[in-house]
């Protein structure tokens, strides 16, 4: 009876859904453009380019977090290989503007034109996001730090001072982008204005009471973009569902963009999920969010667009080593990205797709050096299960042209034979193609549920699979079941196995389907009467059953790749998940909208970067990390295969594919890290030290523009004096006696400081993961006081400027107050303060590496971290012949360790290397260390607070065919001193078209005598 009842419900619901579909198909949604061009248009369904609809599946990368331009190709080729149609990037105002007189888009890795050119070459659209504010877990949210003094107002408004500051950068960024727009045959699709600036309304957005300041600010940015040549649509991204800002469907109050979008991080943007409760509520793993109703309410005539959807999460200070990939891994990618499709989203960009590294002082205080983000492409540039899982869906969305125009017909458990499973039905009103997106009814439950699905098709209502087997949801999983799916000139009536992709060769489709290993599947193709098994690798229980208008094929797929041939010429490739992970569909065109005739199919390698056909030769570029069997499905005209420029011996299979074998790459062994030398890097603690040179500035400001004034004068905020990064040194002078000093210092989460009087160590604030300001009362022993002049040295490390409204939070000494020896006499005052920071301050002494790279340690000011510095007079450290070195000293001070190590990595390989820093078990942990590689600061190691120990350093920063200068600045914050173990390791070796040997020429300038004046 229960079964009959479900069938009756299905019949009734089918009648209602058919009527609903008819009504929806009759809806005339307006087709929008920006009034400047009709190249890019959009409507209720999706974006269109030159009249073709496109599913925008995009991912974010930050060029400024991987400052080796040759490696941008690596990242973007990996993005393209997933099947993505676009990529997005923030530009960084701070990265291009070392001071308020300079905008640099030409020096070293600041020239971003290769990114635009790669987009055209590789065939991907771009979502360009210039800010000027970008957030991004970057210091001050990407604002240049000279902006944070208060001199330019409170920021992110229409204040003329702030407007004058951002205009040169924003104009430059717009002018560069204007040369590479879709409207002129290039690939910039849209241009985002500001970032997560949900400030259009005062109070409840439903009241539509405009925030005139915010409106004016947005209009200034929009006008600047247009004045400087932007002709593609302008977009925005709401930070959450509450702000409802800048969309014309909601209101015409002013400041609106062409297409408004919504950002969402349903599993929290940080490994510390408690930080997301105010936005998402209590964290429940795999709990999904309803976006459909939001888009229907807020922007019904616009595409459902998510400029940022969760691609991972950043790891805060004190977070787990390696981040929290288990929170947003392959299962997350499988479920949440399909959930978005079920919500009718047709444009989404993953934040991040590749995170990179917070080298130098790029990071905001919320995170340490790694910006791996648990993204599909890891910080060390490797790809794994999450990348592959994302690829399974991205290739499908590139192939499923009918998915770009659908209406939501219904959803619920009535679609299935198991009430623990529900489905969302999407249907194309023009072609009647259907997409049933299935989930556990409670997505937080990850059990194994079996079911059959009630579907509407062109031959009527069916319950599938019709024959043997069931559909399974095993774990946190979703599946998209298609009906009346366009297959060239054929029709896939339905498939309970997911479609990966398809291609058409000689007018005959090759359809690729996949199921999790060991599961069964069933599909039906119209106009077919019979079929046969041509290769049964892992496939079993294959049954062909002819129906009136179609052929039903039922199968079970274990590990491997199987091939079926149908009598109407359709070839079907069946894969289990492991095989699907190694299956690729490289495009033969540079058009992001890839047609089914413009691709080949490849199985086996770790990565296929590109493919091209010339006469009878198919040229493949890619990576292999082990001995691999290469199998290719291509046009019959292809007879030869080249892999990375070399012809490989091929054989043809009985079912028409070509096979070849790729050899394993060689093993790479790194030389030992030995022959270390060291030197004292804190002479400033000594009373005899002379601070009258160019490195030092008198800190004598008696007023400040900062909205948070200090408790004592002079103003001891580092940014006031042009020193913005990391470690700054303060020398305070006073005469006569004092019993101590009260210090209150602010530096961001995980910051720290230490103090010395007349060369004698006093105390330190070691820091905690959550403390951004700390005060101490330090007592002076009479034995270390001088009767006349005394010098107090404070070494202060900050971890960047806060984001959003916290960008103006000062960095430095909030209060410095000497204490009297007795209550009857007043406390002495400081007679002078001097400050040292980055050599040259804002003058950008090293324009290649830039102002974020260095801070104020003596070693850095003197250039000890740079290639070519002569350390022959330094103290040799005990060396070993092992691959690692243990470096140690006693006493509270700063010491710099240095060695030079040659590398000779062969051409034709992509090799990834990481440094590993650790503290020996018996050594103290009260220290901070910075890792330098050929002059670049590529690691902040703080064992007292943080857990990051692995620091990837890319080729180009490392010289793979030459000498490498490795430096460590170690700041012991206690008298126990410090001990640090230094190792390095190979992450992977790939035979690759990306031959990284020789990368980075010109990016590693050496030491010059100019450094000596900053002693």
Curated annotation (Swiss-Prot):
Q: Which domain of life is it from?
A: Eukaryota
* Location(s), subcellular: Secreted
Concerning SUPFAM superfamilies, the annotation shows: (Trans)glycosidases, Beta-galactosidase LacA, domain 3, Galactose-binding domain-like, Glycosyl hydrolase domain
Catalytic residue positions: 196, 308
Q: Catalysed reaction per UniProt?
A: Hydrolysis of terminal non-reducing beta-D-galactose residues in beta-D-galactosides
One GO cellular component, as annotated: extracellular region
Give GO terms for biological process. Answer: polysaccharide catabolic process
**Which Enzyme Commission number(s) are on file for it?**
3.2.1.23
Q: Which Pfam families match?
A: BetaGal_ABD2, BetaGal_dom2, BetaGal_dom3, Glyco_hydro_35
- InterPro entries, per database record: Betagal_dom2 (IPR018954), Betagal_dom2_sf (IPR037110), BetaGal_dom3 (IPR025972), BetaGal_dom3_sf (IPR036833), BetaGal_jelly_roll_dom (IPR025300), Galactose-bd-like_sf (IPR008979), Gly_Hdrlase_35_cat (IPR031330), Glycoside_Hdrlase_35 (IPR001944)
Could you list this entry's UniProt keywords, alphabetically sorted: Carbohydrate metabolism, Disulfide bond, Glycoprotein, Glycosidase, Hydrolase, Polysaccharide degradation, Secreted, Signal
Q: What are the glycosylated positions?
A: 23, 100, 172, 211, 411, 441, 456, 554, 679, 735, 775, 821, 878
The molecular function terms of the Gene Ontology recorded here are: beta-galactosidase activity
Q: Which residues form the signal peptide?
A: 1-21
Q: Which residues bind substrate?
A: 90, 135-137, 195, 265, 373
Disulfide topology: 271-324
UniProt record similarity statement: Belongs to the glycosyl hydrolase 35 family.
Function noted in UniProt: Cleaves beta-linked terminal galactosyl residues from gangliosides, glycoproteins, and glycosaminoglycans.
**Would you tell me the protein name for this molecule?**
Probable beta-galactosidase B
Q: What is the lineage of its organism?
A: Eukaryota, Fungi, Dikarya, Ascomycota, Pezizomycotina
